């Protein structure tokens, strides 16, 4: 059991770190390409996970969820967390309005691309299965499946139209100015709203589970599409 837990924790941690790191790095690379070097000047245009770690969102909360689920139900059914946001100065972008839309979209876009790429990688692991240890093959396929799942969930969650999530910033960029200002004004409360919806209200209202609904009704259909796009049947 201990060995299985170690393998499961390693697969979960690596999949989550890759998804979060590349998501944040994509924002930084996009901002730099579009004229804003703020993130680059702060060392955030980087593939080094340490530069994107948030103590609570990347370490403490995911660790608590991971350990509590393994100890209570013996498996991991849900994870939640966040990285340190990449700083972007929209006024340094060559086109502040549409530049911010593209910078915000870069994070979810890289997650969708990674999900598809891991789906393709599964073919390679399967083809090499006879020359790999059985445990190694199983672990790699588990890691690939988790990577696809986490990347799709991270992308779908971040596309929710609520600042400071990417979807909210995209919405601000495409709405007419009066509506954009109203939506942008929600950003100061955005994290509190998300925490309330994901953690607080589900404990107070029976059957209220917006994160579960997002996963079931949006992320899992997208995941199935990614599997098909990667050539894993219909």
Please provide the spans of the model-predicted regions.
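Hydrophobic transmembrane alpha-helices and their immediate loop junctions
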Residues: 1-234
């Amino acid at each position: 059991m201990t060995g299985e837990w170690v393998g499961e924790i390693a697969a979960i941690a690596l999949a989550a770190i890759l998804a979060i790191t590349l998501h944040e790095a994509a924002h930084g690379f996009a901002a730099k390409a579009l004229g804003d070097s703020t993130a680059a000047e702060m060392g955030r245009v980087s593939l080094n996970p340490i530069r994107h770690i948030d103590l609570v969102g990347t370490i403490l909360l995911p660790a608590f969820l991971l350990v509590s689920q393994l100890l209570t139900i013996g498996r991991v059914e849900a994870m939640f967390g966040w990285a340190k946001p990449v700083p972007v100065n929209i006024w340094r972008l060559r086109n502040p309005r549409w530049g911010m839309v593209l910078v915000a979209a870069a994070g979810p876009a890289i997650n969708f691309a990674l999900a598809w790429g891991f789906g393709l990688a599964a073919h390679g692991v399967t083809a090499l299965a006879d020359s790999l240890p059985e445990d190694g093959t199983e672990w790699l396929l588990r890691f690939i499946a988790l990577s696809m799942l986490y990347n799709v969930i991270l992308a779908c969650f971040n596309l929710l139209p609520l600042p400071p999530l990417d979807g909210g910033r995209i919405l601000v960029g495409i709405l007419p100015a009066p509506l954009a200002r109203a939506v942008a004004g929600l950003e100061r409360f955005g994290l509190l709203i998300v925490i309330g919806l994901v953690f607080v209200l589900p404990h107070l209202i029976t059957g209220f589970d917006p994160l579960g609904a997002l996963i079931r009704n949006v992320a899992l259909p997208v995941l199935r599409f990614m599997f098909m796009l990667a050539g894993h049947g219909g």
